[in-house]
């Protein structure tokens, strides 16, 4: 595979926690997720020992906790989390959407969810 592209709305979305929906796509070294939270959503504190995470909010607002610091992220705002940094989050109201980028990619991006591949069907992808 040299490269590919797809539309988020054409990829499968999975509910990975209550009211927390993920659409995943991956390259050789980078995983990208579209996350959609419907209030109320809570993601417990966790960390990623094997990758750095970038969060880019595109719709709505979320409360993000990084170590002992809590702040609101709004559309256009970005947070970058080095490996092993404890973080979590919760919804404020309504619906929020953000993009997560993981480098290197995580196993969740490679395997997809509930045993299905997160990779798009090659017949449905336009080469770039």
Predicted feature locations:
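Short, conserved beta-strand element in jelly-roll/cupin
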Residues: 37-38, 47-64
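Short acidic-glycine-tyrosine-enriched beta hairpin
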Residues: 69-83
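Conserved short histidine dyad/triad with adjacent acidic residue
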Residues: 18, 33-48
């Amino acid at each position: 595979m040299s490269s590919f592209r797809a539309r988020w709305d054409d990829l499968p979305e999975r509910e990975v926690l209550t009211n927390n929906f993920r659409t995943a796509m991956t390259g050789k070294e980078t995983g990208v997720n579209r996350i959609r939270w419907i209030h109320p959503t809570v993601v417990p504190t966790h960390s990623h020992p094997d990758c750095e995470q970038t969060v880019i909010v595109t719709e709505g607002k979320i409360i993000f906790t990084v170590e002992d610091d809590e702040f609101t992220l709004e559309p256009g705002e970005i947070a970058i989390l080095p490996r092993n940094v404890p973080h979590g989050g919760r919804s404020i109201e309504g619906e929020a959407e953000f993009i997560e980028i993981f480098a290197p990619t995580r196993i969740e991006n490679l395997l997809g969810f509930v045993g299905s591949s997160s990779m798009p069907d090659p017949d449905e992808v336009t080469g770039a």
